[in-house]
Structures are given as structure tokens and as C-alpha cells.
């Protein structure tokens, strides 16, 4: 099972049992797309993991130990401002979608009550963790900012009004009426893919298991499936909130199940991400150095004119009395080659200043050679 709406339904019940009325004591962000809230509830400390990871997105209690960054970023500082010390008032799933809302109350700097909602959207690469002002519906902060150019349907930026993800029109399998459900079960194709289209929040594994159950009394079987008590279990390739036909190992809670299932997978993914980031940085540095080398080679080539500038300065100094004041060039005897040489002049400068100009060019290129070859 993926972390679908069906699984989140059962997880929401688990979180309510453990966290309602609890107080948020600490907020940390151990990884870029993950938030960990330390909550004191029922005389126990719990760690609530909220993940907006594109592959491993989920919400769960965890016993995993995380290392936190030494310097908090803007996102985590805003989260701490609004959530530290807050009391959890409500935890609810939106329909049977992969969206969880955690409503909390807190006090601001002057003692006034502040109500905010933490929205966790588990939607693959579009997963997000968003903090809302409850009264206005405005976004305070989000772990992923989404501008209009990225999504024309809704922007996820501080100050924007929160707009929920678009609805597909599918039915909530937990609340659909008997009459409508009976009609669907006796007129529709009940293959897994079709069940996913009709009913909200069914992953492929859940839909496959449900399809296999719908045999004789379909209405009764359907209701029993969605009323089944939670039985966290590992399957051949994944995990489930119920005992599925391919279940292998049972665990005591859904959170323990996810800790067991994701521990090695998430760690490997983080290592791969860090390796990819390191490779990207090395490649960027190599590209910068290649460009720098090309530029230095061009500059080094230009320094080959240094000796020519020195000789022109020497010739102008030697034959200073032959250099006119108002001309843009002068022809002199070049005692270095035994031939005539034409030297360009700046008419705005005196003969001596023109000579010094060539010496300055020579010195500049000479220093450049030292720098490039050091």
C-alpha cells in the first residue's frame, strides 16, 4: 500500500488518540522536506514526523533519532514562532484525500490567542507542509513555495489565500450513502483501476484488495472493508493498515509499521540525494574552473605584448625631442631591430606622458604574468 487516503484515515485515528490536547514543545527540520514536532501528551513525549518528500511523503509518530541543522532557516523559525507552546485542538483528514489538517491554538507576544492550521498535503512531487492563519485562510509559510508560473491554479506563497488542491469528483468511500453505493456496486466494473476512479483516496494496493473482496454480498463486504479495525502489517512489497491477503508481519501501530518500512529506504534515499548534490557541486566547480582557465589563457596570451610596450616607452624616452605634441603617431629609429618603427600617440598627452603610458601598460601586464603563473 502506498500512503493513500485509506491509510491516512486510519493514521488520523491513531494520531488523535495520542496527540489531541497535547502541547508542542519543540520543532525541528532535520531534512529539507521534513518537519519533526516534539509533543507532550498524556504524560508522554511523542515525535510527530511530517514529510513532504516526493516519494516517502507521510505523517506518523516516530522513534527515529534525527540530527538537526545547527543554524535554523527562515521556514523553521516561522514554525517555531507560531507552533512552539501551542496546544493541538483538532486533527482531521480532508474527506478521504491525502490531506491532513492539524489545528492548534497559541498565545502571541502580548498574550492574545492565535489559531493556526498546519496542512500536510501528501501528493507525490506536489507534497507540501503549509501553515495557515485560521481566521483569514492566508498562508503564513510553506516548506515549498509555488509561484503562479509553476501552478496557475493556486500559488503557495506567504500572504496568499490558501486554495485546496482541485477535487476529482470521486466519492468518499467512508461516507457514501447505501443507495448510491448499491447502484455503483451492481452497475459498475469493479476492477481496481475503476474503483480508484470512483472512490477517493484508494491506492493501487488498496483498490486491488477491495476488488478481490467484492464477491457475493457486495454492499455488506464493502462496508465491512472500510469498517475493519486497524491491523498494521508488512506485505510482500509494501505495508497496509489492514490484514491484506499478502500480509507477512504484523506490528502494534501504524507509526511503528512506517518506522520499520521506511527506515532503510529513507536513509538510502538521503544518502543518494546527498551524493547527487555533491556530484552536482563538484561538476559546477569544475565548469567554473574550466571557464577560469580559458580566461587566464587568454590573458596570458595578451601579456606577450608586454615587452613591446616597454620598448616603445624606452624609444619615446630616448628620442623625446623628436616626438611632436599634437600628432597621433611618430616614426622613430628602433635600435632594438635596426629598422624604423611607428608608435601610436595620444594627442591629449605630452611626449613624456605618452612614454609613461607605455611603461604603465608594461608594468600592468608584467604583474598579470606574475599572478597568472603563481
Residue map of PLM features:
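Extended, highly charged segments
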Residues: 1-374
Amino acid at each position: 500500500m502506498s500512503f493513500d487516503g485509506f491509510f491516512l484515515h486510519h493514521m488520523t485515528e491513531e494520531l488523535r488518540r495520542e496527540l489531541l490536547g497535547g502541547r508542542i514543545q519543540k520543532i525541528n527540520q532535520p531534512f529539507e522536506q521534513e518537519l519533526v514536532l516534539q509533543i507532550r501528551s498524556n504524560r508522554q513525549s511523542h515525535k510527530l514526523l511530517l514529510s513532504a518528500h516526493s516519494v516517502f511523503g507521510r505523517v506518523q509518530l516516530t522513534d527515529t533519532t534525527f540530527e538537526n541543522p545547527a543554524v535554523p532557516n527562515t521556514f523553521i523559525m516561522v514554525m517555531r514562532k507560531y507552533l512552539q507552546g501551542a496546544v493541538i485542538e483538532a486533527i482531521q483528514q480532508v474527506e478521504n484525500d491525502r490531506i491532513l489538517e492539524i489545528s492548534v491554538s497559541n498565545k502571541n507576544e502580548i498574550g492574545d490567542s492565535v489559531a493556526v492550521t498546519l496542512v500536510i498535503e501528501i501528493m507525490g512531487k506536489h507534497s507540501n507542509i503549509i501553515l495557515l492563519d485560521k481566521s483569514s485562510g492566508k498562508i503564513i509559510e510553506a516548506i515549498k513555495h509555488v509561484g503562479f508560473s509553476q501552478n496557475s491554479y493556486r500559488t503557495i506563497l506567504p500572504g496568499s489565500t490558501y486554495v485546496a488542491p482541485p477535487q476529482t469528483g470521486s466519492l468518499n468511500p467512508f461516507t457514501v450513502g447505501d443507495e448510491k453505493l448499491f447502484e455503483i456496486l451492481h452497475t459498475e466494473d469493479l476492477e481496481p483501476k475503476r474503483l480508484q476512479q470512483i472512490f477517493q483516496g484508494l491506492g493501487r494496493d488498496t483498490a486491488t484488495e477491495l476488488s478481490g473482496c467484492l464477491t457475493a454480498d457486495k454492499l455488506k463486504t464493502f462496508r465491512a472493508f472500510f469498517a475493519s479495525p486497524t491491523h498494521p502489517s508488512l506485505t510482500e512489497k509494501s505495508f497496509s493498515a489492514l490484514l491484506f491477503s499478502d500480509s507477512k508481519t504484523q506490528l502494534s501501530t501504524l507509526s511503528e509499521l512506517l518506522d520499520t518500512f521506511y527506515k532503510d529506504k529513507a536513509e538510502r534515499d538521503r544518502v543518494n540525494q546527498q551524493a547527487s548534490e555533491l556530484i552536482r557541486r563538484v561538476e559546477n566547480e569544475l565548469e567554473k574552473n574550466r571557464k577560469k582557465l580559458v580566461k587566464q589563457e587568454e590573458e596570458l596570451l595578451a601579456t606577450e605584448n608586454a615587452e613591446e610596450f616597454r620598448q616603445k616607452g624606452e624609444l619615446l624616452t630616448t628620442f623625446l625631442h623628436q616626438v611632436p605634441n599634437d600628432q597621433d603617431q611618430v616614426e622613430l629609429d628602433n635600435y632594438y631591430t635596426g629598422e624604423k618603427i611607428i608608435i601610436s600617440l595620444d594627442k591629449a598627452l605630452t611626449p613624456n606622458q605618452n612614454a609613461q603610458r607605455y611603461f604603465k601598460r608594461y608594468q600592468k601586464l608584467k604583474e598579470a604574468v606574475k599572478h597568472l603563473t603563481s
